[in-house]
């Protein structure tokens, strides 16, 4: 049990590298994810297609790779599963021992209602700003998973009575992955004497789900991503965005995944559906050569899994705030904060550093800190010519 549960987070780290807001951008990640108005033209396809054209004199650029992973275990589920694995082995060896009965029943009871989350992704982009129509071709992959047990009261009673039987309590992994291949196109228009950038992103999507269900004492990390647990589908989707800039002030609005899509998981004792629905985000930013301050507000909540079993609380509606301080174009210090209006996620502090010698090579790293059991990191490399 201990080895397999801990290894799950490692497995998702590698899975995310080929699986897909659904984006990783180390610069904006460090700024709390507030990229709707503050992202640069290389990452515009991830946040707001209008930003490709906001600075038409920018240089040709390449972003690759950008990669990140986040692990959130607010209820200490991983530790709880490890503890249960240890005491359950002792119980099986001597089910009549009263200490084994008490420790095992308590360990199983403590798993009830706990949940852990894992997410990660990778991406890359090529951007060509022009004075007419600017373009950003990008590929990004992202995956997220929920690990949750379903505990049976009858198992707890059987253990307390010293009955060594097969457990009916389950461990479940629900995972979703998406690969986006898109082309963000944007241009500038004059409206009431103001310059406004307008962008659109047609994109193809490859959608995946995994649904792995097994007895809580028989979880094996080598089995969760077997073909029989997988479903997949393909879809066309679209993002849109607008951005207004007056001196250092920016206001922007982005709509992502305007075409709703649902994909069902494999059927086990339950069946779930993952929902890809539109997300609208309003962003503002104050951008100068030495500092950037940004704020993003999701205008609607985002629901993910629904199903026939107990409700999975994974809907979010985020407020993000961030800042970047630039040392004359050579190094950057960043920080931010994320708050979930739906209270699904705990508040997240983000930090990051950037190095950009001669403003040609850009290397960015970020870290997110939620609590002692929840954290994340991302990194990226970019070239501007």
Question: Where do the language-model regions lie?
Answer:
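Gram-negative bacterial Sec-dependent N-terminal signal peptides
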Residues: 1-19
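Subset of outer-membrane beta-barrel
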Residues: 20-385
